[in-house]
Regions:
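Long amphipathic alpha-helix in the N-terminal Rossmann-like dinucleotide-binding domain
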Residues: 67, 298-302
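A short, flexible beta-alpha/helix-coil linker loop
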Residues: 45-50, 95-97, 280-281
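Conserved catalytic cores of soluble enzyme domains
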Residues: 102-239
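A structural preference for short, pocket-lining loop segments at secondary-structure junctions
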Residues: 36-44, 60-103, 114-131, 151-156
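Short, histidine-centered active-site or binding-site loop motifs used for metal coordination
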Residues: 43-47, 101, 161, 209, ...
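Amphipathic alpha-helical segments at domain termini/boundaries
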Residues: 1-42, 184-299
Length: 302
C-alpha cells in the first residue's frame, strides 16, 4: 500500500455523517486563445452562502479524486479551482474532525497537505480562482496553485487559525512567507488574527501579493480564465518580487515577537508556534515545512 493509499484509508476510517461534505465537481472548459482545456474544479457543499464550503475528511477525499481525474486526463492541459458563488472555502470542518478520535487531527493535517500539494506538483499548471470568502484552508488551497486571481469584492481572506488556538496547518505557515516575505506573513498569520480576527478584502489581498491578478465580480470567472489562457500561451507574464531572506526576515520575526507579547502577553501557545514556523520557513524546504505544520497541530491537539 502506498503512503497516499494508507492516508486515504485513515481518512475513511475517521469519516462521519457529522461532516457537511463539500464536493469537488470537475468539468472541462475550453480556454480562449487556443490555450487548451482547463480542468475546472468547483467546491460546493450544496448549501447557500450562509453555510460556507469546508474541508473534512470526505471533502478532502472528494477533492483528491477530482484532482487525480484532471491530472490523468490527457485532454486537460491545466487545472483551476474555485468555489460556489461568493465562497471558495472557510477552512477545516472542525466539528467533523473533533469526533474522529485521537489521531483525527494528525490524519486530516497530513491529508490536506497531500491533496493540496498535488495542485502545485501534479505536472500541469494550476490556477486558484478566489471568487469570494477564503479563510484558513480555503485560502491555503489557492496558495498551493501555481497562479491565483482574486475577485475584487471578495469579503474575507485570511488565516485566522491563531485566533482559534491553532496554526495554519495546510501549508500556509510555509507558503505565505516564501511567497510574499516574512513581514507580510506576520501580518497575515499573527497580527490580523490577533486584531479581533481582521481579514482582507480582495483588493487588499492582491496588494499584499497573495494573488497575481484581481478582477471585478460581474464576470470574474470569465476574466480569470482569459487571464489564465494568457499565462498558458505566454502573452501574460507573472512577475513576483524576490523574497528577502536577510535582515528583512530578522526584522519581521522581531515584530512578530512584539505582536505576540502585546496581544497575548506571551500566553498563546499557538502564536508562539506560529512564530517558530515562520522562522523555520526561511530555510526549510517544502517537505520539512509541511511536516512541521503537521507536528504542530498534532502537539496542540493533545
Amino acid at each position: 500500500m502506498s503512503a497516499m493509499d494508507s492516508l486515504v484509508a485513515r481518512a475513511e476510517a475517521i469519516s462521519s455523517d457529522a461532516e457537511r461534505v463539500t464536493e469537488a465537481k470537475l468539468r472541462k472548459v475550453t480556454l480562449p486563445l487556443g490555450a487548451g482545456v482547463l480542468g475546472l474544479i468547483t467546491l460546493d457543499n450544496g448549501e447557500d452562502h450562509t453555510k460556507p464550503n469546508t474541508f473534512g475528511p470526505r471533502g478532502l477525499l472528494s477533492l483528491n479524486a477530482a484532482i487525480d481525474a484532471a491530472l490523468a486526463d490527457d485532454e486537460v492541459t491545466a487545472l483551476g479551482i474555485t468555489g460556489k458563488p461568493f465562497i471558495l472555502a472557510a477552512g477545516a470542518d472542525l466539528t467533523s474532525i473533533a469526533g474522529g478520535g485521537p489521531d483525527a487531527v494528525r490524519t486530516v493535517a497530513e491529508l490536506g497537505h497531500a491533496v493540496f500539494r498535488k495542485l502545485g506538483e501534479g505536472g500541469k499548471p494550476s490556477f486558484g480562482f478566489v471568487n469570494g470568502l477564503a479563510l484558513g484552508g480555503g485560502l491555503e488551497v489557492a496558495l498551493h496553485c501555481d497562479y491565483r486571481t482574486v475577485m475584487d469584492s471578495a469579503p474575507a481572506l485570511g488565516l485566522p487559525e491563531v485566533m482559534l488556538g491553532l496554526i495554519p496547518g495546510w501549508g500556509g505557515a510555509w507558503l505565505v512567507p516564501n511567497l510574499v516575505g516574512a513581514d507580510k506573513a506576520v501580518t497575515l498569520i499573527l497580527e490580523n488574527p490577533l486584531s479581533q480576527g481582521r481579514t482582507l478584502g480582495g483588493q487588499a489581498a492582491f496588494a499584499l501579493g497573495l494573488a497575481d491578478a484581481c478582477f471585478s465580480g460581474a464576470d470574474y470567472l470569465e476574466q480569470s480564465m482569459l487571464w489564465a489562457a494568457g499565462v498558458l500561451t505566454g502573452s501574460v507574464t507573472v512577475d513576483r518580487p524576490e523574497v528577502d531572506r536577510g535582515e528583512a526576515w530578522d526584522a519581521a520575526l522581531a515584530r512578530a515577537e512584539e505582536i505576540v507579547a502585546s496581544k497575548t502577553g506571551g500566553a498563546s501557545p499557538a502564536a508562539r508556534r506560529a512564530v517558530e514556523l515562520v522562522a523555520a520557513a526561511r530555510t526549510a524546504d517544502l517537505d520539512a515545512g509541511f511536516a512541521a505544520e503537521d507536528q504542530a497541530l498534532d502537539d496542540m491537539s493533545k
